[in-house]
Curated annotation (Swiss-Prot):
Species the sequence originates in: Mus musculus (Mouse)
Gene: Ip6k1
Alphabetized Gene3D superfamilies for the sequence: Inositol polyphosphate kinase
Disulfide feature: none
Name under which the protein is recorded: Inositol hexakisphosphate kinase 1
Stretches with biased composition (Basic residues): 113-123
Amino acid sequence: MCVCQTMEVGQYGKNASRAGDRGVLLEPFIHQVGGHSSMMRYDDHTVCKPLISREQRFYESLPPEMKEFTPEYKGVVSVCFEGDSDGYINLVAYPYVESETVEQDDTPEREQPRRKHSRRSLHRSGSGSDHKEEKASLSFETSESSQEAKSPKVELHSHSDVPFQMLDSNSGLSSEKISYNPWSLRCHKQQLSRMRSESKDRKLYKFLLLENVVHHFKYPCVLDLKMGTRQHGDDASAEKAARQMRKCEQSTSATLGVRVCGMQVYQLDTGHYLCRNKYYGRGLSIEGFRNALYQYLHNGLDLRRDLFEPILSKLRGLKAVLERQASYRFYSSSLLVIYDGKECRSELRLKHVDMGLPEVPPPCGPSTSPSSTSLEAGPSSPPKVDVRMIDFAHSTFKGFRDDPTVHDGPDRGYVFGLENLISIMEQMRDENQ
């Protein structure tokens, strides 16, 4: 068993799933739409990801005015594999103790050599979450012949009331419905495979604890945007730098300073999330990027015009903050745009469509009929939106970790991307008034 069994456990977060009397059973974060490291759910308000020391130090060094636009940094946990009574292996988090010998992932996943996936069966188990759509846990068991298979055998048992579907960018056809974002499953399988192959001695791994920025949203619609005109860090090898520059040149990263890295948007007409991944985003033209943004703001029945001003206000605020951050560079970082896919106005619209009635514009509020008093927002309540910067494994600024390269002025590539994103949204708003 894992060497961290004897550690004392501190306070658990709200609705954290306990593993025996000691650790917290980690579950896949079902709303992950992009990235390459698997995000794990620690509790309702907290997620965790493999620790990269540069990213940890960056969170610890954030300027105060940037904290509004980044997830709250909550510390570090030790993570290891543990078996349960059914023979499955789970990822379990324990309080981090400074004296422990732990592994941390200072080499981003895409730089690591490819490994054969061990054959395994993924098993879902329930959690203690209050949110039905988040009742999912993945674990795996190995077989004697597991080393020969190149990809895992997946067994899914749905626990979600809200299915996800990946839309194919070529055919326009949807994949089968599953109970969490397909990209989340992909990242989690890769993470387990890599950690499993490296954990013959039951090593401990360090994971960052971060705020779950979608926990305020009932039906989180998430757009993951890779920001900036450059994606490689100052310490990248010549080979990797060339590879990243090609990706930028062949996508809207070069022309707009921003490209789609993933998204999920709740569709009122079907009751499921429509999903896109980074490969879709890489192939978009400027017009294709506009169309993707339009799709992100469309709920299957209507364009969410009420979202334009709240999102634009957040983006303008972020731009103003970043323009004041001299020497900062956020290479390969992403920007999350989030809103709730099922709010009062949308529910009223869906009700009238279902009943074949004409659309009634007045939203619910104090003066509405009793039949609509259970709906959430009032007429003066703007829709809830959020904008957060994430992924700082390649970020730098003057004096950070004695980095030899020091840059002048703000991150102009990132600001360029924000300017274009704001401009496109303003044009879309004006065209759809």
